[in-house]
Structures are given as C-alpha cells and as structure tokens.
C-alpha cells in the first residue's frame, strides 16, 4: 500500500457511495458500492483475503470515490460506472446472448417478424423463445393460420406468399380492414396463451367441412390442429396464470456466485440463463449488481413479474426494474425460486468439480510426477525431439509445459546446422547446447525438468552437454516408446532406470501429452521445411528465375502443383517476362515427363 492510498483511506466518509479502484496506469480495474464507504474501502487493505481478492488488491495503485444520497442511488451509479468503464475485475455479462421474440409490427397492415431486440416502437413483442428454431416454428404455424402481409407497401402485384395462401397482399388488393384487424387480434390471443380457443374453432371448421363432404378442407384443418399441438406441447407448463415472469435464484461458495434465471412465458418454462462469476463484496450486494446489469447490458425483456430470494433487498430491485418484484413465501412461486437456487448450487458444485479435475490433470499430475521421480514438482518442463528422413532437412523442436499446460508462445524450432547425415545424438548435442547457452546468456528461466523423446544415448548426450559444457544441473529424463510408437517408459536417474508409473495415472497421461506434442511440433516443422526445399529445388537452374521471382510465384500460386498446371499466359500474368515464363513452363513439363518415364 503506497502513501497516496494511506492518505486517502484516512479521509474516507462514512456515507454511501461508489469507489473506483485504479492500477498504476490509471485504468479503472474495479468498481464497487458501499453503504459506508469508509468501512468497505478500508477492508481491502486490512487482514487476509482469498487469492482472487489478493490479486485485485495487488494491482490497486489509487482509488476514487463518489458519495451518493442513498444505497439505491449507489447501486444505480455502480451499474452505470461498470457499463461505462468495463473494469476487468467486475462482474461483466460479456455473453451477448439474446433470445428471439415474435414481433407484431406497428404499421397500417402489421407484419409478423422474429427479432432479438425489444425496441420502444409501439410494436407488440411475445417471448422470449428458447432459440430461433422455436420462434421460427411458431411463426410458420401462424403464417399458415393467419395470412398477414409479407410484401412491401410498394408491391402492387401479388407476391409469392399470396399464391401460397400466406399473404393477403393488402397493397395489391382491397382488403377489409376489419378482417385484417381480427386476424391480428387472434394472433395476439394465440401468443398470449389462447391457442386452445383457436384449436376449438378449427375443430368446428373441420367437423363442418367433413359434414359437407369437403374432405380436403377438413384434412387441412386437421393438419393445422396437429401443428398447434406439436408446437405447444414441446414446452412444459409451470403455472396456470399465464403471466410472464423471470425467476432468480443464487448460490455462493469459495468467493464465487452462480445466478440462475428461469424464463417463464405464458405459464411455460422456456429457458434458463446461468452465470458464474467471482465476487468481492457482500453476496447480496453482488446479486443486486448482477440483476441490474442483466437487464441493462444484455437487453433482456423485462417481464410483468420478477421473483427473487427473500434475503435480497426488494426495494433496491424495484428501483432497478420498472416491474412487479415479488419475494414469494409459499406455494408454486416459492418452489420456483427454491428450484432456481438449487440449480445454482448444482452448477457451482459442477464448476468446482471441473476445476479439481483440471488441476488433477495439470498441476496435480506435475506434483505426482515429481514425487515419482523424487524431485521437486517440475512446474516448468521443456521437451525435445528430432525429426529427419535419411538425414535430409534435419530439425529439432522444443515444447514447454508450465503447470502441466502447454505454453505455446515459448515453443522453439531448430534447424540443425553442424550435423551431416542422420545422427540423432549429434543433433541433440547441438540443440541442447544452443538452447541452454542462450538461457544462460539472456538470463531466461531454467526448466525444472528436461524430457528427451528418445532413449539412453540421447539422454546421456543431453546430460553431458549440460554438466560438462555449460556447467548447469537440470534433471534430464528420457521418454521411450513401444513398437506402436506410443509412450512406454520414463527413464531417469544416474543409470536411467524405469520410473514406475501407473498407465492410467494422470502423471503418465501428462507425459503422453508432452511426448505427442513435441513429436507433432517437430514433424510439422520438418514437413514444412522439406516442402519448402522441394519447391526451391524444382525451380532451381531455370534461366531468368531468381529468388525474388520464385517467392512471387509461390505467393501467387501457393504450391508447385499449381505452378506446374499454369499456362505460359498465366505465368506471364503472375509477373514473369514472357521468355522466363516459357522457360519455367518448359522446365517443369520436361521434368514431369522425365519423372514419369523413370
């Protein structure tokens, strides 16, 4: 804690407000609210905290605060400040997932549309639907039942949908406004839960058509009834009052919060939203911040009712939302809130289980590997592999694993410079010397363990370079493979003995991942180099074709195959003089012919 912070802490007021934590660059990294600023802000710099809070505090170089008249005013201000500054340590609802709605437009002849944005445009919105397929299904059904306008006002001739019976084309024909208005009212009724009335009317029409021998019409009405049943029975009923409501529940553990939101529309539970995030303040305060951001930043539709747990300040939620807020004490609504909270607890437990499993695969495996080898946990592991074909284009590659995870930005590729022919020992000697002489020279971190994809000979070479040429002491082990080219044994110690490892253990799986990764990286580099050299050799000794023109050809045609397939005119268009283009064409086609003859 610097002097500036100490001085400011002494001046903090005992009033409600917001505080803005800044890093050394003056960037706002966290925004919080407090009932008493003095107590809340000082708490960050006193006593012990969990790891994530300590990380936040370690970055604080300065802070500001804004005093407000009330706690609710502080809550509203906090949400606005978070939205404006996007602090990295705040609850940020970065998932821009929005759910689709069915919209009846506010026009002379309204249309049905699917949209993800609810605007203040005097249109009617119904939803949200769990996904766009559900919304499309419902809209297609309504298009069959009610032929609202699909065409533009400028359309003076019948559109395609008119011929399909799904558009009245009111701008091409005279349409009774009352007929159109009645259709819109029926759609509103359907989307508000009145589909049973429409089914009853269709049943009557089907019976009437059948009685009058109009069997095609009767079959059409029957299909429409089935379509309604199919669409409506896919969603589970949760309430009989058909009120749109969002149901909130939450759970906290180990400094993390999970909030679950159930979306209930026309009495149906259609979807849920799950958010898991760390929090630094009081849990109920963090929940209030979440609910404010939930509706403000993700543009969620605000329903007629919002149900919240009874330990949340209802007055604060009402200040955030212009809708009815309830804290049910009994009955079905109470069960829904409890169910949302139960699901939140389950989701949070699943997250921690996944973290534990991930740790077992990574840092846990590293610790167990260290125990098996009787060395400190090898937090940083560097692994090497050679690759060549009959000594051509020899390369080596190094991969780095930190805490059991690949650190790909630290991978390195090596072209072998001092070795002629297939000599893996000499290649390994060169690469180990190049790597660790540079580590010494530049003061880079040494690994805790070096793994060599190879047997005793290559490991001995690596150990000799480190001890006798560079004077460094780093544990070196070998990864041997079986006849199926799979990780078989870990060789370690003065006499390179087999380290006993269970084949289904996480430490063995870690070694497999490292060996597979270094092999992949080395062989990919070798193939790239071989392909590049092959390309260059095929274009060697062509009169007029220098390095620059070769490079331009590769850039233009991407491969030797494409260059060979190109005509003289295409080669000329790629920037070659006509004489050189003919030389290239003649050379490649002569070479192809001679290769076929062989």
UniProtKB/Swiss-Prot annotation:
Gene3D superfamilies: 5' to 3' exonuclease, C-terminal subdomain (1.10.150.20), GIY-YIG endonuclease (3.40.1440.10), UVR domain (4.10.860.10), UvrC, RNAse H endonuclease domain (3.30.420.340)
Gene that encodes it: uvrC
Tree of life domain: Bacteria
Chief place of localization: cytoplasm
GO CC annotation terms, alphabetical: cytoplasm; excinuclease repair complex
DNA repair recorded as keyword: yes
Lineage: Bacteria, Bacillati, Bacillota, Bacilli, Lactobacillales
PANTHER family in the cross-refs: UVRABC SYSTEM PROTEIN C (PTHR30562:SF1), UVRC/OXIDOREDUCTASE (PTHR30562)
Organism: Enterococcus faecalis (strain ATCC 700802 / V583)
Quaternary data: Interacts with UvrB in an incision complex.
Molecular function (Gene Ontology), one example: DNA binding
Chain's role: The UvrABC repair system catalyzes the recognition and processing of DNA lesions. UvrC both incises the 5' and 3' sides of the lesion. The N-terminal half is responsible for the 3' incision and the C-terminal half is responsible for the 5' incision.
TM stretches of this protein: none
Record domain GIY-YIG: where: 14-91
UniProt record, GO biological process: nucleotide-excision repair; SOS response
Domain UVR: 196-231
Alphabetical UniProt keywords: Cytoplasm, DNA damage, DNA excision, DNA repair, Excision nuclease, SOS response
Family: Belongs to the UvrC family.
Localization (cell): Cytoplasm
Protein name (record): UvrABC system protein C
Keyword Chloroplast attributed: no
